[in-house]
C-alpha cells in the first residue's frame, strides 16, 4: 500500500536510466494545483455528508500519504519517463469519474492511487514505449497486486472509455491553462507535444484490453 511517509522515504526506484534528472513539465504543476483544490473541496464536502461514497473504495488507503500531490506527480514523471500528455489524459479520466460517479469523492485517502493508476493507463494508450504495472507499482508505492486491481476497477468505472479525442484533449489543455493564469502558476502549456495522431477519435483499445 502507499505509505504515509514523506516523499524522501518512498523506496528509490532502480531501473533503466532511473536516476536521470529532467525538468518538471509545467503541466504537472498546474494539475497538482487543480487536484489539491479538488481534494480540499471534497474533504469539506465529506465532512458535511459524513461519507466519501463507495465507488472509489478500491483506491482508498489506510491513511493519507504525507507526500504532496506535486511531489508524487514529479516522482511518477521522473522514473517512468511518460510523456507530459499522459498527465493531462489522466486528469481527463479523473474528471470523467467525478461526473459519472458524483457521489464518490476524490479525497486525500485515494487521490495518489487514482493518479498513478490513471497516468499508467494513459501511458499505455499514448506512449509507444512504457513500463509495466510492476514498475509503476514500485514508483507509486503500492503493491503490484493492488495496482492490477485498481487498473481493472478504473476501467470498469469508466466503462472502458479511455480514448480521448484531440478536441477533448485540447479543451482540457485550455482549461488547465486558464487555471494557470488565474493562479499565476506558470506561463504556458507549450511543453505538451501535439497529440493529434495518438489521441485521434479512431484510437482503440483493441491491443490492450480485449
UniProtKB/Swiss-Prot annotation:
It holds the Pfam family Cyclin. Expressed in roots and flowers. Expressed in the shoot apex, leaf primordia and young leaves. GO terms for molecular function: protein kinase binding. GO terms for biological process: cell division. InterPro entries: Cyclin-like_sf (IPR036915), Cyclin_P/U (IPR012389), Cyclin_PHO80-like (IPR013922). Keywords: Cell cycle, Cell division, Cyclin. Gene3D superfamilies: Cyclin-like. It comes from the Eukaryota. Interacts with CDKA-1. Belongs to the cyclin family. Cyclin U/P subfamily. This is Cyclin-U1-1. It comes from Arabidopsis thaliana.
Amino acid at each position: 500500500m502507499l505509505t504515509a511517509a514523506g516523499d524522501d522515504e518512498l523506496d528509490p526506484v532502480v531501473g533503466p536510466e532511473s536516476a536521470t534528472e529532467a525538468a518538471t513539465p509545467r503541466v504537472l504543476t498546474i494539475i497538482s494545483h487543480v487536484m489539491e483544490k479538488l481534494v480540499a473541496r471534497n474533504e469539506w464536502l465529506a465532512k458535511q455528508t459524513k461519507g466519501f461514497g463507495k465507488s472509489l473504495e478500491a483506491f482508498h488507503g489506510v491513511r493519507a500519504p504525507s507526500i504532496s500531490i506535486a511531489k508524487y506527480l514529479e516522482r511518477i514523471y521522473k522514473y517512468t519517463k511518460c510523456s507530459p500528455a499522459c498527465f493531462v489524459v489522466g486528469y481527463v479520466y479523473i474528471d470523467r469519474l467525478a461526473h459519472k460517479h458524483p457521489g464518490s469523492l476524490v479525497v486525500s485517502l485515494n487521490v495518489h492511487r487514482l493518479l498513478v493508476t490513471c497516468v499508467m493507463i494513459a501511458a499505455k494508450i499514448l506512449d509507444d514505449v512504457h513500463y509495466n504495472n510492476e514498475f509503476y507499482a514500485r514508483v507509486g508505492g503500492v503493491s503490484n497486486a493492488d495496482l492490477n486491481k485498481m487498473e481493472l476497477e478504473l476501467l470498469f468505472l469508466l466503462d472502458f472509455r479511455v480514448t480521448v479525442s484531440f478536441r477533448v484533449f485540447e479543451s482540457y489543455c485550455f482549461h488547465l491553462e486558464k487555471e494557470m493564469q488565474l493562479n499565476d502558476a506558470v506561463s504556458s502549456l507549450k511543453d505538451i507535444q501535439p497529440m493529434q495522431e495518438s489521441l485521434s477519435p479512431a484510437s482503440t483499445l483493441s491491443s490492450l484490453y480485449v
